[in-house]
Amino acid sequence: MRIVQLTTDAREHYRQYDKPVPYFGTAPEALLQGFSHLPEVEVHVVSCTQQRMVTPEKIAPNIFFHSLLVPKMGWMRTGYSGCIRAVRRKLREIQPAIVHGQGTERDCAISAVFSGFPNVLTIHGNIRLISKLNQDKPFSFNWLAARLESFTIPRSQGVVCITRYTQRAVLDLAKRTWVLPNAVEAAFFDVRPNPQTDKPPRILCVGVICQRKNQNAFIRALDTLALKQKFEVLFLGSASAAGAYEDEFRSLVQARPWCRHLGVAGRDELRKYFAEATLVALPSLEDNCPMVVLESMAAGVPVVAAHVGGVPDLVEDGITGIFCDPLNPASIASGVEKILTNPSAAEEMALRAKEKAWERFHPKAVAQGHLKIYQEVLSNVS
């Protein structure tokens, strides 16, 4: 089967045009890793860019890469019309059986629905819900992206929902839905947890520093626990240089000797942090299919996660992790304390989580799940 994956090259997103290797984000990268193990498929990754970049012909023996140059006027200000036209031209050359638009907030979804070929979409961020939560101003990026999401969903053959949370959000718009979680890069399954016993327990909190990720409330929630137990909290993620929430975060971290903000970590670094962590915490107010939870489970690291959004699809409370209420400081502290004070039970949960992750999130398993969806779509189209 010949498949096209429309996805964003991170070099375009972050304007890092000098980097020699394309990168498509953690979930799409892991899915491609899975496809590379399926010899029955031929995959073409197509990404639009505003500047020429180094473009390898192949990412894997059965995975080709196409970088399409689109002038600035062909992007969001014109409804991604330039991207749509460039993609259609390339697809006429490739002649795929099916097109998969990864993400609804930029050019990928709308290019998929106007591709002229059978297509499906994956929603990674639930932009309509995020925009509503953030109360975004009219004509801001998220406000426009939310409307783009509403436009594209009903025009596709279906939506691959990475959690039931997403499925519920699109049922009123989508022609068809399937629930299939994101894949996790295979290297995370090779992590061997080895917390440093000669140092305080290490709590890892990974994510962009922002109100939705709720780091400030998480810090305050642990103040009382820090009076009776030693631990350290490491925050990994970018923080805007200007912003009231980010400024408050920096003040909270600086005032507490048990807190550190280490900025953005690369994929190899992240796995090293996982190996040394006692637990990973996700205190978000809203999240769909947080990769840090999937990756923690794959690595065999205990998880304390907020009972919000799509997280209940990923974690079973008391079985493969611990839930907390992100609006209740006592609940957050209690979840963390359960892991810190009962390491044997925490280890058992982490082992069960790793088993579940092998079944549900391994790249090959998720790629095979996608292949079944594509076959269903094509059987209905024909």
Describe these PLM feature segments.
Residues Y165, A183:
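Carbohydrate-associated surface elements
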Residues L285:
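Aromatic "clamp/platform" in nucleotide-sugar-dependent glycosyltransferases that forms part
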Residues V4, V160, P195-K213, I219-D223, ...:
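Conserved donor-binding/catalytic core segment of Leloir-type glycosyltransferases
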Residues D317-G318, I322-P329, K338-S344:
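Conserved acidic donor-binding segment of nucleotide-sugar-dependent glycosyltransferases
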Residues P302-A305:
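Short hydrophobic beta-strand element within catalytic cores of glycosyltransferases
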Residues M1-R52, S382:
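N-terminal subdomain of nucleotide-sugar transferases
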Residues S140-G158:
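Membrane-proximal helix-turn-helix segments that form the acceptor-binding/catalytic region
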Residues Q229-W258, D268-R271, A345:
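Short, structured helix-loop element that forms part of the nucleotide-activated donor/catalytic region
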